[in-house]
A protein has these predicted regions:
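Alpha-helical transmembrane segments and adjacent TM-loop junctions that form the membrane-embedded core
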Residues: 2-21, 41, 45-47, 51, ...
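First transmembrane helix
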Residues: 20-37, 133
């Protein structure tokens, strides 16, 4: 007799998809305007910010794609479905941002050697519009970013972009009142530094999740203590915790029971407590004591 247990879980992502679409439209429209004005007035600050905003649009598109493909049902080949695509997209987004930083640095060095005349008024007005666009986008993502690495990355990008636009406005005003056009290049270097700092955590966490490290939202010491404190569990071993996606986690553990007749009750307790600790997919292997093994937590 065949037995099949599906691990497919339905999560409402329609509202998040709509938010991503609105953010993409807003930012893509602004990129076209900002890049056009940057070319006309030879502003590296505007061009570098437009390039970064374009990478944000691409990142938002990738995130939207990942959320949609993650909804596909599991199959015989992808038994967890395509949920891990959200982690891969998060890692891709971090790499794209690092490439953008490299491009800004190269262009900044060129502009330092070959300075050009820049219109402070055009820079200020365009970047001022950017504050509004990026601010609205960050606000739309703010409520959704607490429990999802992809959304948090997008939110941080937009929040940083808002600050960057503030910096570009300041450089435009300095050019208007002092004529010091090199400030535009210095602002570009500052933009690159801000992007690098905001990307580092995203890159680090994405790489860790890609390598099946314990997610940062999971406190493994608390889980180990919780397992040890459940009555009827004499010892445990082979505890493994990893991320299935940027929002779902899984765990497997072997527990050694004092009384095998209490197996179902203990498994139910352990499963419930792990759910409370943000682990959604749990596999528990039960063994009767005495059980001989060399793991540190065994009896």
């Amino acid at each position: 007799m065949k037995s099949h247990h599906s691990h497919q879980h339905s999560h409402p992502v329609t509202s998040l998809n709509s938010i991503f679409i609105i953010c993409i439209i807003l930012n893509l429209s602004f990129v076209v305007v900002e890049a056009g004005i940057g070319f006309i007035y030879h502003s590296l600050g505007l061009l570098s910010d437009a390039g970064h905003n374009l990478s944000d649009v691409f990142s938002l598109l990738l995130s939207l794609f990942a959320f949609r493909i993650a909804r596909h049902r599991s199959n015989r080949h992808f038994t967890y479905g395509y949920k891990k695509s959200t982690i891969l997209v998060s890692l891709t987004n971090a790499i794209i941002l690092l490439i953008a930083v490299g491009g800004i640095l190269i262009e900044s060095i060129y502009k330092l050697r070959n300075p050009e005349q820049i219109s402070g008024e055009a820079i200020s007005w365009t970047a001022g519009t950017g504050i509004i666009v990026n601010g609205i986008t960050a606000w739309l993502l703010m409520k959704k970013q607490k429990h999802d690495l992809n959304v948090r990355g997008a939110f941080l990008h937009m929040a940083m972009d808002t600050l960057v636009s503030v910096g570009v406005v300041i450089s435009g005003l300095i050019i208007i009142y002092t004529g010091f056009t090199l400030i535009d290049t210095f602002i570009s270097l500052l933009i690159a530094l801000i992007i690098l700092l905001s990307t580092w955590r995203l890159l680090k966490e994405s790489m860790c999740l890609s390598l099946d490290a314990v997610p940062s939202s999971i406190h493994i010491n608390e889980i180990e203590k919780m397992i040890s404190n459940i009555p009827g569990i004499q010892s445990w071993h082979h505890l493994h915790i990893w991320a299935i996606s940027t929002t779902e986690n899984a765990a497997t553990v072997h527990i050694v029971l004092e009384d095998i007749r209490q197996m179902e009750n203990i498994k139910q307790q352990l499963r419930h407590k792990m759910h409370e600790m943000n682990i959604q997919h749990i596999t528990i292997e039960c063994e009767a004591c005495p059980y001989i093994c060399n793991e540190p937590h065994c009896c």
